[in-house]
Regions:
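Extended substrate/RNA-proximal surfaces in nucleic-acid metabolism proteins
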Residues: 2, 65-70, 74-230, 290-291, ...
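Active-site phosphate-binding/coordination module
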Residues: 84, 88-121, 331-436
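An N-terminally biased module of ancient metal coordination in phosphate/nucleic-acid-related enzymes
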Residues: 1-96, 181-182, 194-202, 206-277, ...
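Substrate-recognition/cap helix-loop segment adjacent to the acidic, metal-dependent catalytic center
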Residues: 223-236, 354-374, 475-493
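Non-catalytic pre-domain segments flanking phosphatase-related domains
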Residues: 1-8, 304-316, 335
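Conserved acidic, metal-coordinating active-site core of Asp-based
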Residues: 150-215, 408, 412-415, 419-530, ...
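Structural recognition of alpha->loop->beta junctions
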Residues: 228-241, 282-305, 366-382, 443-444
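Mg2+-dependent phosphoryl-transfer enzymes with acidic/Ser/Thr/Gly-rich catalytic loops
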Residues: 305-313, 330, 502-559
Length: 559
């Protein structure tokens, strides 16, 4: 067993930026470019918080996933940039423009998108009037021209200012706000806005974390800011921007005191807009900003209902670890598990190389049903949330990989199977199938032409293939492995989980990466993760956890 005392999760040394804008509102870098910049800056995560818009989130997430797929395993699991769905809602409070940042809301909900679209249309109507008013006085501008210069963006006053600067009508962007379109300027037209209370309630309705942005930018004074926080806290405000690009050390300290006073989550960000805010950098603001990852971890724990930063999470293999020789759980083990979860408020994850449908059946048969319980199947390729009854993470082998694996298995005289839903799928069932299904109670679909048309036989790309040889695994499996690795170099994870089983998994699918992902997802420091296992496929999990426990009955590599 390894002690967690000296364990350090590198994620917690990295900064985050939870307030960032792209070209989908008034920033000058695309969502894809922001992902690259965040990686170059060494950020663990950033929140895309465009004004009244969710249009850039999918692009940023796709860019982040694509970057991870082309990184090494270690880079993908430890330093891949996480993109957080965010938004910045403009509201009106006592004649002032107050901004509410929302994180982790359900941006795919049609009702959410419809409401945000209405916010956007109100902004469009206001901007059209402002541009028309300027044009009437001879200023060379039209809303259509600004829109053409910012394709796909939600147009803000910053876009209008940038257009006037780029067309050489004004000498600086600041001039536009001080003389033309600032709140007290002749061409400013206010727009109908929702109240900050309604913005907070709106975000909470869709599962979001509402945060008061840059609290000292509104110049409310101490009493005024206190009153605003009281009103917003009453309707569900969850956070306040403690770290901000313009905050002095004293203001940061003051904001942290307010967070503690009102039991709010501290957040922080640069409010990066690219060249629209000269000198302001992503992640570091004007040079002194550092938003610690621990703040994001706290926000994640709040979202998932995790009590605090001391909560522990136990990842446990079943076969040869949690389970007895009769594939059950002993009374003493069950009592210890109950105490760990119910008595101390910790979390449990049943982690197995088995197919997810079988892991679910196993948990049901064993009557394992704890609050905040998760299942990890296919050696970590799939994660399942038991409370929400849904899969939220899945990595797969391509149909091309599956087709090649089946063809090579036939060439080498090896039995191979894959999985589709709750079924084992193979071309020809035999003694290996019978051996496997002694304990894994899944239906078998045979005579399936997986090696010819996997895209027809299978309903979706699978998480895993399994080669079984009961006679001469040391002689027959290595040549097969060599051929498969030559066909897909560095694209699969091939591992002998026992003397007879060769696991064929997606390249990043290991129990260790699953542990890392789930801890990151929940906001739990890996020093608080415990893992127990007995086989080679458990080793990455034991190495990734703060405390790794190798079973005495296990193979030497699991010690």
């Amino acid at each position: 067993m390894r002690d967690a005392a000296a364990f350090s999760d590198p994620l917690y040394t990295m900064p985050v930026d939870l307030h960032v804008h792209s070209t989908r509102s008034d920033g000058t870098f695309t969502p894809t470019q922001l992902v690259s910049m965040a990686k170059e800056k060494g950020l663990a995560a950033f929140a895309l918080t465009d004004h009244d818009s969710v249009n850039g989130i999918e692009e940023a997430m796709d860019a982040s996933i694509d970057a991870a797929k082309h990184a090494s395993i270690d880079a993908a699991r430890n330093t891949g940039v996480e993109v957080i769905p965010g938004i910045e809602l403009s509201t009106e409070y006592e004649g002032k423009d107050v901004h509410i940042v929302g994180l982790y809301y359900d941006y795919e909900d049609p009702d959410f998108q419809s409401a945000v679209n209405e916010f956007t249309q109100e902004r469009v109507r206001r901007n059209q009037k402002m541009c028309a008013k300027m044009a009437a006085d001879g200023i060379p501008i039209s809303y259509e021209a600004v829109e053409a210069a910012n394709p796909g963006a939600v147009i803000t006053r910053a876009n209008i200012a940038r257009y006037l600067y780029d067309t050489h009508y004004i000498s600086s962007i600041d001039y536009a706000f001080s003389h033309l379109i600032g709140d007290t300027c002749p061409y400013f037209i206010p727009r109908e806005k929702i109240s900050p209370e309604k913005a907070v309630s709106f975000l909470r309705r869709f599962g979001g974390i509402p945060i008061l942005a840059h609290p000292f930018e509104y110049h409310l004074g101490d009493e005024g800011l206190d009153l605003l926080l009281q009103r917003l806290k009453a309707v569900g405000l969850m956070g306040i921007e403690v770290y901000y690009c313009k905050h002095s050390p004293e203001e940061t300290e003051k904001a942290m005191a307010l967070a503690k006073k009102y039991d709010l989550l501290p957040s922080g960000g640069s409010d990066f807009h690219g060249t629209n805010k000269p000198g302001l950098e992503l992640g570091t603001g004007y040079g002194h900003l550092f938003v610690p990852y621990s703040l994001l971890a706290g926000i994640k724990r709040a979202k998932h209902g995790i009590p605090d930063e001391t909560t522990k999470i136990f990842f446990c293999d079943f076969d040869g670890t949690l389970g007895t020789s009769k594939k059950d759980i002993s009374p003493a083990t069950r009592e210890a598990l109950d105490s760990f979860v119910y008595g101390r408020g910790n979390l449990f994850v049943l982690s197995s190389g088995r197919a997810m449908s079988d892991v679910k059946s196993l948990a049901e048969r064993l009557r394992l049903s704890y609050p905040h319980m998760f299942l990890s199947g296919y050696n970590g390729a799939e994660l399942y949330d038991c409370d929400r009854e849904e899969t939220f993470f899945r990595e797969t082998l391509s149909f091309k990989m599956v087709k090649t694996a089946f063809a090579l298995a036939k060439k080498h005289g090896l039995y191979i199977q894959t999985y589709d839903g709750d079924a084992i799928v193979t071309e020809e069932a035999g003694k290996e199938t019978a051996y496997y299904t002694r304990y894994v109670k899944m239906p078998v679909r045979e005579n399936a032409l997986v090696g010819e048309h996997p895209e027809v036989v299978l309903s979706e790309e699978p998480c895993k293939c399994l080669v079984i040889d009961l006679e001469d695994p040391r002689g027959k499996i290595p040549p097969f492995v060599n051929d498969l690795e030559a066909a897909f170099p560095g694209q699969m994870n091939l591992l002998m989980s026992n003397a007879n089983y060769l696991e064929i998994d997606p390249i990043h699918a290991t129990k260790g990466n699953s542990l890392i992902y789930l801890c990151r997802y929940l906001g739990i420091d890996r020093k608080n993760a415990i893992a127990a296992g007995d086989a080679p496929n458990d080793v990455p999990m034991l190495e990734a956890a703060g405390v790794g426990i190798g079973m005495l009955n296990g193979l030497g590599t699991a010690d």
